[in-house]
Design a protein with these regions (language model features):
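Juxtamembrane "helix-exit" motif on the non-cytosolic side of transmembrane helices
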Residues: 23-33, 60-61, 86-93
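Short juxtamembrane and helix-loop transition motifs at transmembrane-helix boundaries
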Residues: 2-7, 28-38
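Core segments of alpha-helical transmembrane spans in multipass integral membrane proteins
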Residues: 15-19, 39-61, 75-82, 112
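Mid-chain, well-packed structural core segment of small domains
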Residues: 64-93
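Short, charged juxtamembrane terminal tails flanking transmembrane helices
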Residues: 1, 129-142
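Membrane-water interface at the C-terminal end of transmembrane alpha helices
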Residues: 109-135
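Cytosolic juxtamembrane helix and N-cap/initiation of the first transmembrane helix
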Residues: 1-17
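Non-cytosolic membrane-interface motifs at loop->transmembrane helix junctions
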Residues: 32-42, 67-73, 96-110
Length: 142
């Protein structure tokens, strides 16, 4: 993957985390999201999702020097995607939509988003790992 694509991927991951939380939670005033899954999506949990977004933005131009942080991003996204899948298979999404459209959209999309960025971060981590195997080689195209 080219450097510009990867940089833009980190920016997109950060922007989606921050903007989706702020918009769909209506700046943390939407009670349906935290009531629907208080263990994971409390207002504090939503705030932490935005903080992860800040971390993604912070490394967009420096990801090559923080391979293991990218690895942590892989784990974070895998956990959220797995939790979402478990939630989706044990809850009634239509009932969430009936209570609040924004909450329904949030619970419909967050796991797909996290799984997509899990794949992206995993590919970046793999590319960084491969680049370390070849001395004096920059496997990531500029």
């Amino acid at each position: 993957m080219r450097n510009s694509f990867i940089r833009n991927g980190f920016i997109a991951a950060g922007a989606v985390n921050i903007l989706a939380v702020l918009v769909l939670s209506r700046a943390f005033t939407n009670r349906v999201i935290p009531e629907t899954d208080p263990e994971v999506m409390s207002n504090f949990g939503l705030l932490m999702i935005a903080v992860w977004g800040l971390a993604f933005l912070a490394v967009a131009n420096r990801y090559r020097s923080v391979k293991w942080l990218v690895g942590a991003f892989v784990v974070e996204k895998l956990i959220y995607a797995t939790v979402w899948f478990r939630w989706l298979t044990t809850h009634d999404l239509a009932a969430v939509y009936a209570k609040d459209l924004f909450a329904g959209v949030f619970y419909s999309a967050y796991g797909l988003n996290d799984f997509s960025f899990f794949l992206f971060f995993a590919a970046v981590f793999y590319q960084l790992h491969q680049a370390e195997k070849v001395p004096n080689n920059h496997a990531i195209n500029r």
